[in-house]
């Protein structure tokens, strides 16, 4: 066996987690690597749509439930750790299936996007985080535009972590060209499987997903985190769904209907940026999930994967 990489891509909520699990179960030896910064946090489960225990008990999943609420996992640290794990899996004859939720981390991992190699400075970072707490996201964006407008454009709405990191690097005195590196992951082939569906159907699915999260206890999950930490500015709460619930609990969002709408719009904005980014990647093999049953989808993807592995 060579060093194959099977990647599952697509906008949030399109069905990547389910396909990855069913694909892993159909292969002789496979592990799933979750590239989703939300799922890194132990306390954030409902709003991040983590794989259920039924999945994680049957197939080894990496990078799920690895951080406490206050911890930050930089793209550089993730790329280093994930690259090491991939080498170990290949040495053991295990096929890695990468589920690309956070596209910046994914493309940094596979060497198609540069990232910061500047070590974090806790003093500077805390100062920037305090600005985020006091003035909010738009203030951070305005500050970043002054020093690095191109980087600001590439940071998705709600990604306070990357905004904070970008400003930290700027305040440390580094120019963008001095602060970046590109990973050199040693794989033989990277088969990229993309999932998509028609716009209207996808929007309906996304709204249903948000409503399910609320009914499943997202508000209570956030309340539990706040009761234990007393801090609504924690990294684990600075993500879509969680920050809106924090606003709801503060009375800034009037009712649950408005809460659902706000979370949906945040997810939709995020998804549109994901779709735009993915359309630029001409190496993705696309599958329309609306045209196939789950079983048919798995069969077609499995055929492609097995053919790829045989030639690796």
Curated annotation (Swiss-Prot):
Gene Ontology terms, MF aspect: ATP binding; tRNA dimethylallyltransferase activity
EC numbers for this chain: 2.5.1.75
SUPFAM superfamilies listed in its UniProt record: P-loop containing nucleoside triphosphate hydrolases
InterPro entries: Dimethylallyltransferase, IPT, P-loop_NTPase
Originating gene: miaA
Chain sites annotated for binding ATP: 10-17
Subunit structure: Monomer.
Annotated positions for site Interaction with substrate tRNA: 102, 125
HAMAP family: IPP_trans
Source taxon at top rank: Bacteria
Binding residues annotated for substrate, in chain numbering: 12-17
Alphabetical UniProt keywords: ATP-binding, Magnesium, Nucleotide-binding, Transferase, tRNA processing
Cross-referenced NCBIfam families: miaA
Record's catalysed reaction(s): adenosine(37) in tRNA + dimethylallyl diphosphate = N(6)-dimethylallyladenosine(37) in tRNA + diphosphate
Protein name, UniProt field: tRNA dimethylallyltransferase
Membership in a protein family: Belongs to the IPP transferase family.
Role of this protein: Catalyzes the transfer of a dimethylallyl group onto the adenine at position 37 in tRNAs that read codons beginning with uridine, leading to the formation of N6-(dimethylallyl)adenosine (i(6)A).
BP GO annotations: tRNA modification
Cofactor: Mg(2+)
Organism: Coprothermobacter proteolyticus (strain ATCC 35245 / DSM 5265 / OCM 4 / BT)
């Amino acid at each position: 066996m060579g060093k194959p990489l099977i990647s599952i891509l697509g906008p949030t909520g399109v069905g990547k987690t389910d396909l990855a699990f069913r694909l892993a179960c159909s292969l002789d030896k496979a592990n799933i690597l979750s590239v989703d910064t939300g799922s890194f946090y132990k306390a954030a489960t409902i709003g991040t749509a983590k794989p259920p225990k039924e999945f994680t008990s049957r197939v080894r999943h990496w990078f799920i439930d690895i951080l406490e609420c206050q911890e930050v996992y930089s793209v550089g640290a993730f790329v280093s750790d994930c690259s090491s794990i991939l080498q170990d899996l290949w040495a053991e004859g295990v096929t890695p299936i990468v589920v690309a939720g956070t596209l910046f981390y994914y493309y940094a991992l596979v060497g198609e996007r540069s990232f910061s190699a500047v070590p974090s400075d806790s003093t500077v970072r805390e100062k920037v985080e305090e600005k985020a707490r006091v003035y909010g996201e738009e203030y951070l964006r305005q500050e970043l535009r002054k020093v690095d407008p191109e980087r600001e454009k590439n940071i998705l709405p709600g990604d306070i972590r990357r905004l904070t990191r970008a400003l930290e690097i700027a305040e440390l005195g580094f120019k963008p060209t001095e602060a970046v590196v590109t990973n050199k992951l040693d794989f033989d082939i990277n088969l990229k499987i993309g999932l998509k569906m028609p716009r209207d159907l996808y929007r309906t699915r996304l709204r249903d997903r948000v409503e399910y999260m609320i009914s499943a206890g997202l508000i209570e999950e956030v309340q539990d985190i706040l009761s234990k930490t007393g801090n609504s500015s924690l990294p684990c709460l600075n993500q879509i769904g969680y920050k809106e619930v924090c606003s709801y609990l503060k009375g800034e969002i009037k009712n649950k209907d408005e809460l659902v709408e706000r979370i949906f719009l945040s997810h939709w904005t995020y998804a549109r940026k994901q779709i735009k980014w993915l359309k630029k990647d001409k190496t993705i093999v696309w599958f329309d999930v609306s045209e196939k049953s789950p079983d048919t989808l798995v069969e077609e993807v499995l055929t492609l994967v097995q053919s790829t592995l045989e030639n690796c």
